[in-house]
């Protein structure tokens, strides 16, 4: 039996371990175009905060350790398309056929376009690269004011990091309260009190419309007309499933749809994780 796993994050890692546990002889090819071992995106803020060493973002060990523990082939190739009905994985270097294919491509942070926001002042928090870039900027000690868009779990962790560095911080969201998808309003109200007690500014029902300069200071102009000084902007507005390799092959509703066996609309093609 030949297996292909497209993507090597947490879902891909656990899938490879389970496949090898159930099939000692089958060929497992893992497609990943990153040099990094699988990591947990939620741990990136802990690294930026200084609560976690770099290695702590990789709970399963480095690639060498993982390959010693589990027998599989790591193919560092970009997957262009998965031809579902043909069970074919097409990469930049050619194509190969498999009996079973798992799509575990994950998700990417959503980065809306903000007029006037310079790329060097815009920060996401999803990948290891995001965490390294954010930490490097904080070390420059040139940030006095920050705005974070998105009152989410990731958003509040970024706010916590900024607050630790003594940076005046605003947390914005179009929703009426913090954690709009995860908490009841009365719970959110209590959390908001505690966040504000730490000196963080909260503003709901508004977001950034565009950026301006005023007397040398970068200003975030909000959709309600408010003006907030903002040397940097954190974009924590959620994620979007990475479905590019299968977008024309399987059923997708915001993400790849699966049945109770994690099988997509194409027999023999499965999906797991944030995709």
Positions of the model-derived regions?
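Glycine-centered tight beta-turn/hairpin loop motif at sheet-sheet or coil-to-beta transitions
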Residues: 91-94, 223-225
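Beta1-alpha1 glycine-rich phosphate/pyrophosphate-binding loop at the start
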Residues: 1-71, 153, 159-182
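Rossmann-like dinucleotide-binding cores of NAD(P)H-dependent redox enzymes
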Residues: 145-146, 153-210
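FAD-site-proximal beta/loop scaffold in flavoenzymes
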Residues: 118-139, 227-275
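Glycine-rich dinucleotide-binding loop and its adjacent helix/turn
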Residues: 105-165, 258-260
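Short hydrophobic core segments
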Residues: 6, 96-106, 228-238
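A conserved short coil-to-beta-strand element within the FAD-binding core of flavoproteins
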Residues: 76-86, 204-216
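Phosphate-coordination loops involved in phosphoryl transfer and adenosine-cofactor binding
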Residues: 2, 76, 140-145, 205
